[in-house]
Amino acid sequence: EAGLLENVQMPFEDPLVGAVGTRQNVYQRDSNIWRKVADWLVNVRYLDYVPAMGKAGAVPCVSGRTAVYRRIAVLPVLDHLENEFFMGRRCISGDDGRLTWLVLASGYKTVHQSSARALSMFPASFRAFVKQRVRWSRNSYRCYLTAVAKGWLWHTPFITKITVLQMLVTPITMGLSIYYLIFARLNLTVIGIVAVFAWLILGRGIRGISNLREHPKDILILPVLAFAVILVALPIKLYAFCTMNKQGWLTRHADQIGGDGQSFTTLDTATVERSVIA
């Protein structure tokens, strides 16, 4: 969006800032329900916990879509970026997280600039949505486990430590919560079952209040959002953990322009034409 370039450069007045990330949203979020879900998840990320970690100077992953780095912070670690290996295998995705941690480990800050905002294409199909989340989860596990093993994580502020650790153990904590709820607390009556679903949906709505302030109508997709969050936190993350060293982009192919579910035909072409004319 207008002003991104000017705004994203502002934090570099501090010589200790090595990387700056921007706020991001889904392009044409209303063109598909899975884009709405993705935009909700992105909004929660960039309205809530990324600014908090950025204020502390340690965003654990400056998203590669619009990451800006200080040149002198990148050049010394370039070889480690281009030749990343995990458990003996060369990594071909997840370079944004890798570079973020290399810069953090070099003593620089990684921050967030909310006034710089970019729109990005996201998948319009459930299949592509799932594959994208699998790739992101694999990248996160490799990146964060490396940060833990090398000791980089322990030198970051508390809020970054606790956020990264929470991301790593989400399948365990959510799995145990649902197991306890179903097998120890669930009263198999209509009221009991309704209460459980109401708790799941209401809880997700409270956690997404920042998105609902901007998009009140998203309350209508709250059940779909709750399903997507459980899907990502449990089966997808569990599968990604077990296959974290399986390399691949999943949503992009050599014989294809653009990612799966991200072609021009998935957009509202009338809106695109109006924006081009404008």
Model-derived segments and their meaning:
Residues E1-K150, I277:
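Non-transmembrane catalytic domains and loops of membrane-associated enzymes and transporters
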Residues A19, H155-Q166, L267-E273:
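Loop-to-transmembrane boundary segments
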Residues N139-H155, K237-M244:
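C-terminal, non-catalytic tails of nucleotide-sugar-dependent glycosyltransferases
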Residues H155-V164, V229, T251-D260:
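Charge-rich, acidic-biased intrinsically disordered regions
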Residues G248-A278:
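Cytosolic juxtamembrane C-terminal amphipathic helix followed by a basic/polar low-complexity tail immediately after
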Residues A149-T160, A184-L188:
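Short juxtamembrane and helix-loop transition motifs at transmembrane-helix boundaries
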